[in-house]
Amino acid sequence: YKLADIINKVTRLQRPAIAITEGHGELDEDQLYDFTQTLLQNYRVDFIEINGKINVLTRRSEPDKNGRSDILLNYDAVVIAKPQQPFDEKDKFILDQYLMHGGKILWMIDPVQASMDSLQTAESTVGVDIDLNLDDQLFKYGVKLNRNLLLDLNAAALGIRTGETGGRPQIDFFRWYYFPLLEAASRHPMVKNMNAVKAEFVSSIDTVIREGVHKTPLLKTSGYTRIAGTPALISLTMLQSDPDPRVYNRSGQIAAWLLEGQFPSLFANRMPPEITSSGEIGFKEESKPTAMIVIADGDMARNQFHLQQGYPLPLGYDQYTRQTFGNKAFLLNAISYLVEGDGLISIRSRELKLRLLDANKVNSRRLQWQLFNTLLPVALIILSGLLFAWLRKKRFTR
């Protein structure tokens, strides 16, 4: 993979350009530090505000000898990471036409507003719907982000202070079911042989039939999933008792999709003739063949910060449990696939994968395996001793 990556870098004429949007409360440069620094090894990265500017994502080429010009892309892909404020119709139109002219988009969207910040000072908080004015646009392209939260017994651990030992706080770790560990939902090269991806307050995504648009599931929850509607009470008191596996029965909820093909414009049959016929805008009602990835978790690209010194940590690394999840690998694969196709991804995905144990089965059969691992060696030693004594006695009786 490294050899192919070097050859690819040397042979291409210029680095592909990635735009990361600002202006709608998205994750900032510090929160995306490790993600962007890693991207900079292969791409040019710009933080941009759309702000109603028609030429921020596309531009017109120089006229040819017949006076005709084309719409060109300023960026090979656009990343939208956890917006918190609504998109106005101008910005939606600019994104729509960027897509229509062949642009690629990585959406990381939270349909439900929920945060651990509120649980720092209280035992509970409420997850509520957030209106970003993007539902109609994403629905037009073929997906529907559901207003729910996914709880999964196969989840990341959360450190909770439970007391003090020798004047130092005692931290115990509990599985926080609102932080599912997502697994590959298909054999697509983007997620093949991938480590679990840590999600935070993630939602499910449904698809809508759109002619000419092919959909591939990328990430899903485990077989022990529960769906909570909104408003959702999120309380730390749930950690005081064991979960009832019977209510975690909504297996394999999809949280990320790849959409490829020719998309219909949200603004088809909605724009006045002076706009649709404008050469400056170059309005298109159907896209060129292109692709997008939609993830129902806005925090997937956010890195943690060191507790004492405050510097950004590698994306996917959890400093509390000292585990590294597959967030960085997945998002780099996503960008690479959108920009360059699956050539390099197919090579990189041949790396070995760390297989996570099924936490629910481990807990339910803990005593069985403890007894097995404790008693079996003792039983084998006793049997070996008895067999040795019998053989020795038999030999000497002759």
What is each PLM-predicted segment?
Residues Y1-R398:
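Short, surface-exposed patches at the edges or C-terminal ends of soluble domains, predominantly
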